[in-house]
Amino acid sequence: MKKELIYKALKLRDMGFPSGDIAEELNISVKTALYLTLNGEDLLKSTESPKEDSEKADIFLEWDSVRASSKRLKHIAKIMCDILGQVEFDGIVGISSGGVPLATLISDEMDKNFSIFVPKKHIHTEKEKTTGFIGQNFSSIVGKDVIIVDDVMTSGNAVKEAIKYLKSISNPKMVVVVMDKSGIDEIDGVPVHHLFRTGIVDIKK
């Protein structure tokens, strides 16, 4: 396990970030983020990397050189627009927070309405939230055909939550993400498209 990743997780924890936000920032699962924040100090003291089997392994994706540049993000957004070219839809819904910049660029490129979905992992309240919500300061998507956009799909939980919510008010037709770690091709009848997909190759010696 990269020590740089552990340092980043601990730094975000000390800044007050909850596990869900740490997972979003580092493109890892919430389970891995929680593990790092609880065990990070011990892992840094260890001289050997812990052995992980294929069921426990998580993949750390770092694409800061792309997402830190609006110019480079525009190129990624244009590829996603090409994927969406044959789909008829009215609006773009970006999943907060990583999907919002991409959804903004796509909606501008394709001249579509824009909205955001805030998943429950980003809602910090004393009351337990069962689902996220659609931002009220953006275009209305009620009764419209929409596309869901995110940057990295790890477990697929945020996308599943978005689809379930959106089906109650609109018609989600497709999900498009930059990187997929889940291996999921369809969620509740909604196809999932990706630019890149990661996977674990289990080699038994």
Curated annotation (Swiss-Prot):
Keywords: DNA-binding, Transcription, Transcription regulation. SUPFAM superfamilies: PRTase-like (SSF53271). One of its GO terms (biological process) is regulation of gene expression. It comes from the Archaea. The keyword Glycosyltransferase does not apply. One of its GO terms (molecular function) is DNA binding. The keyword Nucleotide-binding does not apply. Contains an N-terminal DNA-binding winged helix-turn-helix domain and a C-terminal regulatory domain (or effector binding domain) resembling phosphoribosyltransferase (PRT) domain. PANTHER family: OROTATE PHOSPHORIBOSYLTRANSFERASE, PYRE-LIKE PROTEIN. HAMAP family: GfcR. Belongs to the purine/pyrimidine phosphoribosyltransferase family. GfcR subfamily. This is Transcriptional regulator GfcR. It comes from Methanococcus vannielii (strain ATCC 35089 / DSM 1224 / JCM 13029 / OCM 148 / SB).
